[in-house]
Amino acid sequence: MIDTTLPLTDIHRHLDGNIRPQTILELGRQYNISLPAQSLETLIPHVQVIANEPDLVSFLTKLDWGVKVLASLDACRRVAFENIEDAARHGLHYVELRFSPGYMAMAHQLPVAGVVEAVIDGVCEGCRTFGVQAKLIGIMSRTFGEAACQQELEAFLAHRDQITALDLAGDELGFPGSLFLSHFNRARDAGWHITVHAGEAAGPESIWQAIRELGAERIGHGVKAIEDRALMDFLAEQQIGIESCLTSNIQTSTVAELAAHPLKMFLEHGIRASINTDDPGVQGVDIIHEYTVAAPAAGLSREQIRQAQINGLEMAFLSAEEKRALREKVAAK
């Protein structure tokens, strides 16, 4: 189902949601951190979704073990490097990795700015080593409040040339986008792109707010857009992309089953929607699974899957020249 003549992208992929279980085990031993299990086989149920979680917040607790072992900046650098290695292994030509340095820093009180620098170093080294093209999206974790998000923003701004976009993720219901207007004003002033997690736990009004108040050019998940016909029309007309994450939305119980996922309807409506993983390490999936298993189960035709693959590059935070060069590079292989 993947068109090998086209670039394969993943533009909604959390770096801190893709920490290998083996790495969690090794870092736990290295830093003498107590883990819920001492072998890879027995650890996996604690760090990967085995059965669908009842809600988004329950799903997010599965992420915690990955960041609990980030006891040093070297550990942060390692998982960033491994994220690029994983992207290469799964055949990705281009990936946008998003991360929350405050979340990564929290368990061991690491310097937030230091985490940003370590992630940049690890990703750059990975790109040089494995030949994958990558850009970084800074996440503000809304769950920790406005002040913590301000600290994350300042850390990103210190490396503004290495950050491509700003995102807002976490507890969408408890911390609406209206709390973060000034943060996004500064991000736009820095020349960054804007993508926002919206319409995952909250309704279509959260998506409208992300677009109108925060300046979102893309929406993460956005499944609740299906409830508002005017919003669907607006997304299509303005070419505001939806970063769909099929398996993730089932595992968080955002959508009941793949057959009910709105991605097919987004594509039929002319909305620029793409296929992405979200937190592949926690989900136990990769981009190949999303294209070859999840997308057909969601009712997408072969042509719709191809269109979603095309959309992934069209939506990417790349210049027109960068997109052209990537197309030519893949076509020449």
UniProtKB/Swiss-Prot annotation:
Molecular function terms, GO-annotated: 2'-deoxyadenosine deaminase activity; adenosine deaminase activity; zinc ion binding
Keyword Plastid among UniProt keywords: no
Biological process according to GO: adenosine catabolic process; hypoxanthine salvage; inosine biosynthetic process; nucleotide metabolic process; purine ribonucleoside monophosphate biosynthetic process
Binding site residues for substrate: H14, D16, G170, D279
UniProt cross-references to PROSITE patterns, sorted A to Z: A_DEAMINASE
Annotated catalysed reactions: adenosine + H2O + H(+) = inosine + NH4(+); 2'-deoxyadenosine + H2O + H(+) = 2'-deoxyinosine + NH4(+)
Site (Important for catalytic activity): H221
E.C. no: 3.5.4.4
Top-level EC class: hydrolase
Function statement: Catalyzes the hydrolytic deamination of adenosine and 2-deoxyadenosine.
Stored HAMAP family: A_deaminase (MF_00540)
Family: Belongs to the metallo-dependent hydrolases superfamily. Adenosine and AMP deaminases family. Adenosine deaminase subfamily.
Protein known as: Adenosine deaminase
Organism: Escherichia coli O7:K1 (strain IAI39 / ExPEC)
Source organism phylogeny: Bacteria, Pseudomonadati, Pseudomonadota, Gammaproteobacteria, Enterobacterales
